[in-house]
Amino acid sequence: MKKNISRREWINKSATVIGGSFLGSMIGFSPLKGASLLKEPVRMMYNENPYGPSDVARRAMRKAFSESNLYTMRAALSEFKNLIAELNNVKPENVAIGFGSREILNKAAIMNGIDGGELISPTLTFEAINQFASKTMKTNVVRVPMTKEIGIDLKTTGQMVNSKTNMVYLCNPNNPTGAIMNPKELEFFCKETSKKSIVFVDEAYHEYVMDKKYRSMVSLVNEGYDVLISRTASKVHGLAGLRVGYAISTPKIIKRLNSYMNGSLNVVGLRGAIASYKDKRFQKFSIEKNNEGRTIVTDYLDKKGIEYLESQTNFIFIKTGIDIKKFQPAMEKH
């Protein structure tokens, strides 16, 4: 992989391209062929999982329809919350369940905005919380430039934290670059910065990471640091359309976050998520197929001499060599 390119070139002449898990098959695990997939263009920007939901999750959801005439969401919600707590070695009071991780992001922006503080975020990252914070909450979002390697600059971010800062948003692995941060540097940053403001670490692509050096920041919650972690059932579990996500943080932050939740979850989605998080076989398959698909794409890029960043996710950030304003309409033609 070539690396001798400038940050300006990457930002001005790059696009995110999915290296999706588009390979076929194992009995019971085949790419979905719904009408939307057949009639609509390939939606590369959503990083969807073509294999999910698993058969186990689908059976659980079909069964859940028998209780859909009742207000049974609370029982399912409690069960899912307890499961997530168990899987992550935290207590149920450390967990909040959201209508996808997007609700977690939005409610965190509300929480930050009500306090009247600033939000610090990298210039190249997942924009949901930044857009909601600036447009809906009128929050001042302070942007931190990327490093020369298109990485998140933790040192500069730490230097920009001041008395006005209420929250720092970091995505690890980052979207759209697919890269992870140095675990020791991230842990140090979280420990030091959380003494001054909440550190929000978006781990939406957590399950896809193959780098053995990677480390989730969930363990810091048990140590009492004001760190907020978000994750989603939309990627590895293939439940994007059912909107299930969760947050892990201190009981104080979780309690406040829950006070802004809309209560939009449904029993079918929750039952599907419960079954899927217990279905280790499908998770393993989903991750393996993603790795195979990503390797096919990177091998092709290497063969063609196309520059890209090493990805730990189900998408790849490449240098197209074409201005993004020309690249997008060109893609629409295909």
Predicted features, each with a name:
Residues 1-21:
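N-terminal secretory signal peptides and thylakoid transit peptides that target proteins
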Residues 14-70, 86:
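N-terminal "arm"/small-domain region of PLP-dependent enzymes with the aminotransferase-like
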Residues 54, 226-302, 306-309:
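PLP-dependent aminotransferase class I/II
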Residues 79-118, 136:
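Phosphate-binding glycine-rich loop
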Residues 91-95, 117-118, 164, 203, ...:
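Short acidic capping loops at alpha-helix termini that bridge into adjacent secondary structure
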Residues 111-170:
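PLP-dependent aminotransferase-like
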Residues 154-163, 176-199, 203-236:
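Active-site pre-lysine segment of PLP-dependent enzymes
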Residues 303-332:
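Conserved PLP-binding catalytic core of the aspartate aminotransferase-like
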